[in-house]
Swiss-Prot record:
Record field: compositional bias (Pro residues): 1055-1080, 1402-1411
Domain SH2 positions: 254-346
Lineage of the species this protein comes from: Eukaryota, Metazoa, Ecdysozoa, Arthropoda, Hexapoda
Major enzyme class: transferase
Record's compositionally biased regions (Polar residues): 708-747, 896-905, 987-998, 1433-1448
Protein name per the record: Tyrosine-protein kinase Abl
Chain ranges of the SH3 domain: 187-248
Length: 1620
C-alpha cells in the first residue's frame, strides 16, 4: 500500500505540485504548480506521467478523465501530498468516474475552505479533499500552470465539493495548503488559522474547522481562550492552543518544531511510504530537516538556506518559503532529490486533548503511533495493505491505508461502525481505525497466507484437494450467511477478497468497504476496477445490489475455487459478459468439479435474483453435500486420505475446522477432540484455520486412538500444507517471526517469535541450524522406532505452528521456537521438537498434547474474532486443548508416550537407553532454554550430542522450559532426566515453552481481546480457558501423564501424569492446584502453570512425576520463569506489554490481585526467610526441583559432578509412581516435600539446593518448610503473574500456595529463583546461559566451555544449589548457549521472566533473572550481559564466574554472584540461594524484587542493580565486558543480508546486556569522572543502537549495514575506553 500510496500520493502531490503547489487542494499555488516540474497536475498530458509515478491506480482509474483527470488527481495529490494521497486517487477515480465538474465541485468546496483558511494547517481532511485537489488540480493545473492556482482550486474545489465534504477536505493534507498565496493579510498579526477542528461547546464559543482563518482580537486572563472573529462574521471564544498565527510555520500539519531525530523516526514508524515531517534541530536552532519514511526506513534531509534567504534541499530547486519547498517535494517528478515525494504529514504529538476532535473518543480509534508499519503486503482497490505490529500488544496486524478519494470519510466511519459489530469466525475482524488524519488506516487481524486467489493459484491440486476446497467454500458461505443475517451487502465477494490463515481457515474481507465506496466509484467507468465478472446482471444493468447479488458472486467464487484461481469467463471480453449472460450463457462445469457443486453454482447464477438460494441454504448444502456426511466429515476424510499421503493431521484439521464443533470433535478423534470439538465448534472457521494444521492436532488425537492415524498425520505433514508446516516447523526458527505473522499458512514460519528469540540471542542462529537438525531429527525419531511419535510430532509441530501462528502468534512462536529448538537440541530432536509441540500442547502425550493444544489454538482463534483477540483465545484454547489432550492421552498410553513424551525418545528404546544422557540433557535444554528457534539449538544440540557432559546440562535447562510451556509434566520430565527417553520429551515439552508462547499470545491476545471483545477467556484466556478446557488440573501435565496413559509410561516420561481428576489449574481460584496451563498465554500463565506443576509436583502435581512434582513445581516455576522470560524475549513486546497489565492479574481478575498483594506482603515479611523457599517454589531458584535435579543429576553423571537435586528428583520419581495421587500430592505440597530429599544420586545436593534456594531468601533455615515459603513467594509473584493461580493455591493450602507461588514466582521468585538459578547457572550453566544470551558464538563458546562446566559445576557445586537452582545450570549451559542460558538464565531468568515477563527479556533475558531480583528490568539486562560475559569467562575460570555472580550478590556472595552477571540484588539473592552453603544469604530478599516485576522490562538495569550490589557491580569486570564486546563484534561480522529477524533481536539483546554491564561498570568501576562521563555517553548510544537493532529485521539492508557499522564503531570505542 505504501508503495502504491506513495505512487498515488506522489501523483497527488505531483498533481498538487503542478497544479497546486500553492493550494494544497489544488486551490492555489499556481506558482508552485508551475514551479514543480513533477507537478503531475501541472501539465494535463504530462500529469499522467507524474501520476503514474505517484499513482498507478489513479492513472488507470483516471484514464477516462484522461490527462485532465490525471493532472487533477496529480495536483490534488501534490497539493495534499499526505491528505491528498487518498484524494488524489479519488481524483483519478473521480475524474474517471466523475466528470471534471464533479471534481470541480468537490474541489470548490475544498477550495473554499482553503481560501478561507489559506494556509490549511492540516488540510488532509477527507480522502475527498485529495481527490478534490486531484480533480481541481486537473482543471487547475492547466490554469495553475498559468498561475490561476487559487481560481482553479476554487473551481475544482467547487466541482469536487459535491463529492468531498468540507469535513473530509479539512482532514486532507495537500501541499497546496502551503502554497496558498499569502495575500496581503498574511502579515496581519491578528490573522490566525485553526489547527484543529473545534466544536463549540457553548453559546459563546465559536466552532472552527481546521484551516479556517479567524481574526483574534483578545485573550482571556488565563490566555487559554481567545476571542475569534470568523470570515462569516461570527464571533466567539476558541481555545488559544487551537489556533496559530497565519504567518507561523505551526499552522502546517507537517511542521513539528524542535523535535529530535529519534523522535521523528518514532513518529514516522507508524507511517507509510511518503509519511514525512519537517523539524527543527534540537542542537542547532534554525537548522531544519525533512524526515521522510520510505520502504521501512526514515531518511533525513537537511534544509539549507542560501545567502538570499532561499531554502532548498537540492541546489536545483530553491524556494522562498518552507511551504513552497515542501509543496515542491510533495509532487512526484524527476530529480526532486528526495527518495520519495512528501505525501503524508506525520500527526503532531502535542495536539491539545482538552477538546477532542469528536465528542466521544471512539473506542476503535487506535493511536497511530501504536502502529509500527512493517512491509507492504499488496495493494488493492481501496489502498495498500501493510503488515504492521500493534506495539501496545505486540500483535501482528494488517493495516489497510485507505485511498482518500475512494470513499468519503463520513461514510467510512459509518461503515467502520458496522464492521465493528461484525464478529464471525469467517469474517476478518476489525481491530481498529486511525481516522484522525490521513493516511486513514483500517486495522484488521492478520491472515498469514494472504488472499484466497493467490493461495489457490500457488497451492495447486497437490496441496489442496477437493475436501480442502469444499471446506474453504463452506467457510466463506458461513461468513456470508452471517452477513446476510445482518442484512449486510458485501458487493465485492471474490476470491481476491477472502483471506487465508493457517489450516485453510478462510475469512471474508473487505465486506465493509464495498458499500463505503462512493456510488460513482461502483459505477462502471472506463478503467475502473468494477468487478464485472462477479457482478450479478441486475447490478450490471441497474447498479442494484442485494444479498442475492452477493449470492451470484459466490457462485463465481465457487468456480474460482474449483479451478484453483482461474479468471472467470475465460476468453470472454468484459464487454460481452452481460450480453452472454442475458442470452443464457453460464460457465461450464470446471474439470473435476463434482456435479453437486456445479449445480449449486448454477443456482447462484439464476437470472432472477429471487430464484437464487440464500447463503443460509448454500451453507447448509455445502455442509451436507456429500453422502449425508457433513462437509466437515467429507473434508476430514479427504484430508485424512491426504494425511496418509500428505499429512493425516491436516485432514483432521480441516475436518475440525469444517465441521465446526462437530467436525472438530471428529477430527479431534477422541477425548481431546471432544473438548476441542466443542471449542472449535464455536470457532469453527477460526478453528478450522488452526484446525487444518490442527488437522495435525487431530492427528495427535488420532494417534492416541490410532497409531496408524498418527502415521497418517505424519504423511500429511510430509505432503501438503502439513508437510509445509512440518518443514516450517523445523525451520521455524528461521521463519518464526513470520510465522507469528500467520504468514505460515502451513505453520511454516511458525511463530518463532523474534522477540522471544531475542531473549536467547543465539536462538535464532540456532533456529537456522536447527532447521536441518530438526529435519534430520525428525527422521531420527522415525528411526528411533517412534515413527508414530515422529509423525505425531511432525504434525503437531506443523499444527502447532500454524495454530499459534495466526491466532496465537506468541503461542506459536514460543511453541514453535522451543519445539524447533528442542528438536534440534534433543537427540530425539525430531521427536523432541514435535514433542515439544505436543508437550507444549499436552504435557504428557507429546503428540497428542501438542495437537490438542493446537486445536485449542484454533479453538481459541474462533473465540477471538479479532486477530489479536484470536490469538489470545487461541492461547486459551491451546491450554484447554492440552487439558483435553491429557484426557485423550490415557486412551492410547503407549502411543502417547511415544509422541507425548518426547515419547519418541521414550518409545524409541534405543534412544531411551543409549542416548539417555544426551536425550535428557537435550530435553533439559529444550525445557530450560527454550531457544525460540529450534535451529540454533538444534545445531548446538548436535554439538551437545557429541559430548554427554553437555547433554546432561541440557536436560537441566529443559526443565525450565516446561514451566514456560506450563507443562508441569515436562518439568517432571526434566527432573526425571533419568528416564532418558521420557525426559527428553518432557524437556521438549518444556522447551515448547508453550507457556511462553501462550504467554505472549495471551498477553497480547488477551489485552487485545479485552479491548475488542470482552471474553472471559480473552481476559485471561490461559487461566480460565485452560482450566475450562481441561478439567484435569494440569492440562499440560495431564496431557503428559495422559498421553502416557499409563503411569509407568509417565514415569518413563520422567513425570507421572497428573491424575486426570487433578484440581483445575491455579487459574481458577477454587480449582485444586491446576495443572500449569498448557501454554500459558502470558508469561504469567506459563509461570502459573509451572507453579501449578510445582505445587502438584510438591504434592505430586500433575507433572506426572510424583518425584518430579515436588521438584517439578519448583522446576516448573523455574521453567516457567524461563518461559516467561523466553516469551518476553521471544515476544519481547508482548511480555512487556503484558507487564503493565499483569498478565495473570488481568487473566485472573481482581481477586488474584488482592492475593498478589497479600502474597507480596507475605513474601516481603518472609522475604529473607522465604526467598529461598520462594525460589524453590519457583522451582527455578530451587534447582532442587525436578528440572534442576535432573539437570544436576545428569550433569553430575555426565561430568561426574555431585548433583544437589537428587532429593527433589527422588520425590519426583515418587511422584511418578503416584501420578494419580497428584491431586493429593499437590495439596500436600509442603515445603517438606519439596525439601524432601530426592533419593537420586545427589539428594544432599538437592537438599542443599533447596536450602540454598531458601537461603536465597536469606534464610537457609527452611529446607523442609521452604516449599510453603516458596509457595508464598511464588504466590506473591503469582499474584503478579497469576492472581488466580495464587488464590487457588492459597485455598489449596500450602500446596496450592506453593503452586501459586510457582506461577507467580516466576515473576517474583523468578527474580530470586532466577538469580539463584542464575547463580547455579553461573556456576555451571551460567556459562551456558550467559553465552546463551550472548550469541551463537557465545553459545559455541559455551558449548566448548561446557567441559569446563564441570569446573564451573564445582563452583556451581559450591553453589550446588545454584546448579540445582539452575535446574541443572550446567545443563543449561550445555544447552545451546541460548538454551543453556535460557535454562539457567532463563530458569533464573526464567523465573525472573515471570517478573521479567514485563521486562523485556529479549534484550538480555537470561541475565534478567539475576537482574530481576535486583530490579527486574535493569538487573535482567545486566544479568544477561554479565552472564554472557561471565559465562564465557566462566569456562576459563569458575572463580570468574563466581565473581560475576558476585555482581549480583552481596559482597559475601560476590564471587558467585559474578557468575550471575549484572543482576544486582536479585542476582545476589539468587547467588545466595545458589550457594546454599553460603550462610550469608543476601540480606536482600528475592521477594522484594517482585515488585520489580513490572520493572523487569525496564532498561535501567544498572540502577536497579546498583542498589542490589554496588560492590558486586564492580564485579562486572573490564575483562567480562571486553569479552562481551569481542563476542558482539564477532556476531557483527556476518553479512547483514544473512541476518534474520530473530538474530537481530538476539544481537539487540546482547547489546543490551553489554549496555547493562557497562552501566554497572561505570557506576562502580574505577574511572576518572570525565572518562566516566564519556563512557556513559557511549553506553547510552549503545542502548539506543540496541533498540534500533530490534527493528532491524523490518528495515532494508543499507540501513542495517549502516547500523551495524555504527554498532561496531561503538563497540570499538567501548573497548578503547576500557583499555585506556
Amino acid at each position: 500500500m505504501g508503495a502504491q500510496q506513495g505512487k498515488d500520493r506522489g501523483a497527488h502531490s505531483g498533481g498538487g505540485g503542478s497544479g497546486a503547489p500553492v493550494s494544497c487542494i489544488g486551490l492555489s499555488s499556481s506558482p508552485v504548480a508551475s514551479v514543480s516540474p513533477h507537478c503531475i497536475s501541472s501539465s494535463s498530458g504530462v500529469s499522467s506521467a507524474p501520476l503514474g509515478g505517484g499513482s498507478t491506480l489513479r492513472g488507470s482509474r483516471i484514464k477516462s478523465s484522461s490527462s485532465g483527470v490525471a493532472s487533477g488527481s496529480g495536483s490534488g495529490g501534490g497539493g495534499g501530498g499526505s491528505g491528498s494521497g487518498l484524494s488524489q486517487r479519488s481524483g483519478g477515480h473521480k475524474d474517471a468516474r466523475c466528470n471534471p465538474t464533479v471534481g470541480l465541485n468537490i474541489f470548490t468546496e475544498h477550495n473554499e475552505a482553503l481560501l478561507q483558511s489559506r494556509p490549511l494547517p492540516h488540510i488532509p481532511a477527507g480522502s475527498t479533499a485529495a481527490s478534490l485537489l486531484a480533480d481541481a488540480a486537473e482543471l487547475q493545473q492547466h490554469q495553475q500552470d498559468s498561475g490561476g492556482l487559487g481560481l482553479q482550486g476554487s473551481s475544482l474545489g467547487g466541482g469536487h465539493s459535491s463529492t468531498t465534504s468540507v469535513f473530509e477536505s479539512a482532514h486532507r493534507w495537500t501541499s497546496k495548503e502551503n502554497l496558498l498565496a499569502p495575500g496581503p493579510e498574511e502579515d496581519d498579526p491578528q490573522l490566525f488559522v485553526a489547527l484543529y477542528d473545534f466544536q463549540a461547546g457553548g453559546e459563546n464559543q465559536l466552532s472552527l474547522k481546521k484551516g479556517e482563518q479567524v481574526r483574534i482580537l483578545s485573550y482571556n486572563k488565563s490566555g487559554e481562550w481567545c476571542e475569534a472573529h470568523s470570515d462569516s462574521g461570527n464571533v466567539g471564544w476558541v481555545p488559544s492552543n487551537y489556533v496559530t498565527p497565519l504567518n507561523s510555520l505551526e499552522k502546517h500539519s507537517w511542521y513539528h518544531g524542535p523535535i529530535s531525530r529519534n523522535a521523528a523516526e518514532y513518529l514516522l514508524s507508524s507511517g507509510i511510504n511518503g509519511s514525512f515531517l519537517v523539524r527543527e534541530s534540537e542542537s542547532s536552532p534554525g537548522q531544519r530537516s525533512i524526515s521522510l519514511r520510505y520502504e521501512g526506513r526514515v531518511y533525513h534531509y537537511r534544509i539549507s538556506e542560501d545567502p538570499d534567504g532561499k531554502v532548498f534541499v537540492t541546489q536545483e530547486a530553491k524556494f522562498n518559503t518552507l511551504a513552497e519547498l515542501v509543496h515542491h517535494h510533495s509532487v512526484p517528478h524527476e530529480g526532486h532529490g528526495l527518495i520519495t515525494p512528501l505525501l503524508y504529514p506525520a500527526p503532531k504529538q502535542n495536539k491539545p486533548t482538552v477538546f477532542p476532535l469528536s465528542p466521544e473518543p471512539d473506542e476503535w480509534e487506535i493511536c497511530r503511533t501504536d502502529i509500527m508499519m512493517k512491509h507492504k503486503l499488496g495493494g488493492g482497490q481501496y489502498g495498500e495493505v501493510y503488515e504492521a505490529v500493534w506495539k501496545r500488544y505486540g500483535n501482528t496486524v494488517a493495516v489497510k491505508t485507505l485511498k482518500e478519494d475512494t470513499m468519503a470519510l463520513k461514510d467510512f466511519l459509518e461503515e467502520a461502525a458496522i464492521m465493528k459489530e461484525m464478529k464471525h469466525p469467517n469474517l476478518v475482524q476489525l481491530i481498529g481505525v486511525c481516522t484522525r488524519e490521513p493516511p486513514f488506516y483500517i486495522i484488521t487481524e492478520f491472515m498469514s497466507h494472504g488472499n484466497l486467489l493467490d493461495f489457490l493459484r500457488s497451492a495447486g491440486r497437490e496441496t489442496l484437494d477437493a475436501v480442502a476446497l469444499l471446506y474453504m467454500a463452506t467457510q466463506i458461505a458461513s461468513g456470508m450467511s452471517y452477513l446476510e443475517s445482518r442484512n449486510y451487502i458485501h458487493r465485492d465477494l471474490a476470491a481476491r477478497n477472502c483471506l487465508v490463515g493457517d489450516n485453510k481457515l478462510v475469512k471474508v474481507a473487505d465486506f465493509g468497504l464495498a458499500r463505503l465506496m462512493r456510488d460513482d466509484t461502483y459505477t462502471a467507468h472506463a478503467g475502473a476496477k468494477f468487478p464485472i465478472k462477479w457482478t450479478a446482471p441486475e447490478g450490471l444493468a441497474y447498479n442494484k445490489f442485494s444479498t442475492k447479488s452477493d449470492v451470484w458472486a459466490f457462485g463465481v467464487l465457487l468456480w474460482e475455487i474449483a479451478t484453483y484461481g482461474m479468471s472467470p469467463y475465460p476468453a470472454i471480453d468484459l464487454t460481452d459478459v452481460y450480453h452472454k449472460l442475458d442470452k443464457g450463457y453460464r460457465m461450464e462445469r470446471p474439470p473435476g468439479c463434482p456435479p453437486e457443486v456445479y449445480d449449486l453454482m448454477r443456482q447462484c447464477w439464476q437470472w432472477d435474483a429471487t430464484d437464487r438460494p440464500t447463503f443460509k441454504s448454500i451453507h447448509h448444502a455445502l455442509e451436507h453435500m456429500f453422502q449425508e456426511s457433513s462437509i466437515t466429515e467429507a473434508v476430514e476424510k479427504q484430508l485424512n486420505a491426504n494425511a496418509t499421503s500428505a499429512s493425516s493431521s491436516a485432514p483432521s484439521t480441516s475436518g475440525v475446522a469444517t465441521g465446526g464443533g462437530a467436525t472438530t470433535t471428529t477430527a479431534a478423534s477422541g477425548c481431546a477432540s471432544s473438548s476441542s470439538a466443542t471449542a472449535s465448534l464455536s470457532l469453527t472457521p477460526q478453528m478450522v484455520k488452526k484446525g487444518l494444521p490442527g488437522g495435525q492436532a487431530l492427528t495427535p488425537n488420532a494417534h492416541h486412538n490410532d497409531p496408524h492415524q498418527q502415521q497418517a498425520s505424519t504423511p500429511m505433514s510430509e505432503t501438503g500444507s502439513t508437510s509445509t508446516k512440518l518443514s516450517t516447523f523445523s525451520s521455524q526458527g528461521k521463519g518464526n517471526v513470520q510465522m507469528r505473522r500467520t504468514t505460515n499458512k502451513q505453520g511454516k514460519q511458525a511463530p518463532a517469535p523474534p522477540k522471544r528469540t531475542s531473549l536467547l540471542s543465539s536462538s535464532r542462529d540456532s533456529t537456522y541450524r536447527e532447521e536441518d537438525p530438526a529435519n534430520a531429527r525428525c527422521n531420527f525419531i522415525d528411526d528411533l522406532s517412534t515413527n508414530g511419535l515422529a509423525r505425531d510430532i511432525n504434525s503437531l509441530t506443523q499444527r502447532y505452528d500454524s495454530e499459534t501462528d495466526p491466532a496465537a502468534d506468541p503461542d506459536t512462536d514460543a511453541t514453535g521456537d522451543s519445539l524447533e529448538q528442542s528438536l534440534s537440541q534433543v537427540i530425539a530432536a525430531p521427536v523432541t521438537n514435535k514433542m515439544q509441540h505436543s508437550l507444549h500442547s499436552g504435557g504428557g502425550g507429546g503428540g497428542i498434547g501438542p495437537r490438542s493444544s493446537q486445536q485449542h489454538s484454533s479453538f481459541k482463534r474462533p473465540t477471538g474474532t479479532p486477530v489479536m483477540g484470536n490469538r489470545g483465545l487461541e492461547t486459551r484454547q491451546s491450554k484447554r486443548s492440552q487439558l483435553h489432550s491429557q484426557a485423550p492421552g490415557p486412551g492410547p498410553p503407549s502411543t502417547q508416550p511415544h509422541h507425548g513424551n518426547n515419547g519418541v525418545v521414550t518409545s524409541a528404546h534405543p534412544i531411551t537407553v543409549g542416548a539417555l544422557d544426551v536425550m535428557n540433557v537435550k530435553q533439559v535444554v529444550n525445557r530450560y532454554g527454550t531457544l525460540p528457534k529450534g535451529a540454533r539449538i538444534g545445531a548446538y544440540l548436535d554439538s551437545l550430542e557429541d559430548s554427554s557432559e553437555a547433554a546432561p546440562a541440557l536436560p537441566a535447562t529443559a526443565p525450565s522450559l516446561p514451566p514456560a510451556n506450563g507443562h508441569a509434566t515436562p518439568p517432571a520430565a526434566r527432573l526425571n532426566p533419568k528416564a532418558s527417553p521420557i525426559p527428553p520429551q518432557q524437556m521438549i515439552r518444556s522447551n515448547s515453552s508453550g507457556g511462553v508462547t501462550m504467554q505472549n499470545n495471551a498477553a497480547a491476545s488477551l489485552n487485545k481481546l479485552q479491548r475488542h471483545r470482552t471474553t472471559t477467556e480473552g481476559t485471561m484466556m490461559t487461566f480460565s480457558s485452560f482450566r475450562a478446557g481441561g478439567s484435569s488440573s494440569s492440562p499440560k501435565r495431564s496431557a503428559s501423564g495422559v498421553a502416557s496413559g499409563v503411569q509407568p509410561a509417565l514415569a518413563n516420561l520422567e513425570f507421572p501424569p497428573p491424575p486426570l481428576d487433578l484440581p483445575p489449574p491455579p487459574e481458577e481460584f477454587e480449582g485444586g492446584p491446576p495443572p500449569p496451563p498448557p501454554a500459558p498465554e502470558s508469561a504469567v500463565q506459563a509461570i502459573q502453570q509451572h507453579l501449578h506443576a510445582q505445587l502438584p509436583n510438591n504434592g505430586n502435581i500433575s507433572n506426572g512425576n510424583g518425584t518430579n512434582n515436588n521438584d517439578s513445581s519448583h522446576n516448573d516455576v523455574s521453567n516457567i520463569a524461563p518461559s516467561v522470560e523466553e516469551a518476553s524475549s521471544r515476544f519481547g513486546v508482548s511480555l512487556r506489554k503484558r507487564e503493565p497489565s499483569t498478565d495473570s492479574c488481568s487473566s485472573l481478575g481482581s481477586p488474584p490481585e488482592d492475593l498478589k498483594e497479600k502474597l507480596i506482603t507475605e513474601i516481603k515479611a518472609a522475604g529473607k526467610d522465604t526467598a529461598p523457599a520462594s525460589h524453590l517454589a519457583n522451582g527455578s531458584g530451587i534447582a532442587v526441583v525436578d528440572p534442576v535435579s535432573l539437570l544436576v543429576t545428569e550433569l553430575a553423571e555426565s561430568m561426574n559432578l555431585p548433583k544437589p537435586p537428587p532429593q527433589q528428583q527422588q520425590k519426583l520419581t515418587n511422584g511418578n509412581s503416584t501420578g494419580s495421587g497428584f491431586k493429593a500430592q499437590l495439596k500436600k505440597v509442603e515445603p517438606k516435600k519439596m525439601s524432601a530429599p530426592m533419593p537420586k544420586a545427589e539428594p544432599a545436593n538437592t537438599i542443599i539446593d533447596f536450602k540454598a534456594h531458601l537461603r536465597r531468601v536469606d534464610k537457609e533455615k527452611e529446607p523442609a518448610t521452604p516449599a510453603p515459603a516458596p509457595a508464598t513467594v511464588a504466590v506473591a509473584n503469582n499474584a503478579n503473574c497469576n492472581t488466580t493461580g495464587t488464590l487457588n493455591r492459597k485455598e489449596d493450602g500450602s500446596k496450592k500456595f506453593s503452586q501459586a507461588m510457582q506461577k507467580t514466582e516466576i515473576k517474583i521468585d523468578v527474580t530470586n529463583s532466577n538469580v539463584e538459578a542464575d547463580a547455579g547457572a553461573a556456576g555451571e550453566g551460567d556459562l551456558g546461559k550467559r553465552r546463551s544470551t550472548g550469541s551463537i558464538n557465545s553459545l559455541k563458546k559455551l558449548w566448548e566451555q561446557q567441559p569446563p562446566a564441570p569446573d564451573y559445576a564445582t563452583s556451581t557445586i559450591l553453589q550446588q544449589q545454584p546448579s540445582v537452582v539452575n535446574g541443572g545450570g550446567t545443563p543449561n549451559a550445555q544447552l545451546s548457549p541460548k538454551y543453556g542460558m535460557k535454562s539457567g538464565a532463563i530458569n533464573t531468568v526464567g523465573t525472573l521472566p515471570a517478573k521479567l515477563g514485563n521486562k523485556q527479556p529479549p534484550a538480555a533475558p537470561p541475565p534478567p533473572p539475576p537482574n530481576c531480583t535486583t530490579s527486574n528490568s535493569s538487573t535482567t539486562s545486566i544479568s544477561t550481559s554479565s552472564r554472557d560475559c561471565t559465562s564465557r569467562q566462566q569456562a576459563s575460570s569458575t572463580i570468574k564466574t563466581s565473581h560475576s555472580t558476585q555482581l549480583f550478590t552481596d559482597d559475601e556472595e560476590q564471587s558467585h554472584t559474578e557468575g550471575l552477571g549484572s543482576g544486582g540484588q536479585g542476582s545476589a539473592d539468587m547467588t545466595q540461594s545458589l550457594y546454599e552453603q553460603k550462610p550469608q544469604i543476601q540480606q536482600k530478599p528475592a521477594v522484594p524484587h517482585k515488585p520489580t516485576k513490572l520493572t523487569i522490562y525496564a532498561t535501567p538495569i544498572a540502577k536497579l542493580t546498583e542498589p542490589a550490589s554496588s560492590a558486586s557491580s564492580t564485579q562486572i569486570s573490564r575483562e567480562s565486558i571486553l569479552e562481551l564486546v569481542g563476542l558482539l563484534e564477532g556476531s557483527l561480522k556476518h553479512p547483514v543480508n544473512a541476518i534474520a529477524g530473530s538474530q537481530w533481536l538476539q544481537l539487540s539483546d546482547k547489546l543490551n546486556i553489554l549496555h547493562n554491564s557497562c552501566v554497572i561498570f561505570a557506576e562502580n568501576g574505577a574511572m576518572p569522572p570525565h572518562s566516566k562521563f564519556q563512557f556513559r555517553e557511549l553506553v547510552t548510544r549503545v542502548e539506543a543502537q540496541s533498540q534500533h537493532l530490534r527493528s532491524a529485521g523490518s528495515k532494508n539492508v543499507q540501513d542495517n549495514e549502516r547500523l551495524v557499522a555504527e554498532v561496531g564503531q561503538s563497540l570499538r570505542q567501548i573497548s578503547n575506553a576500557l583499555n585506556r
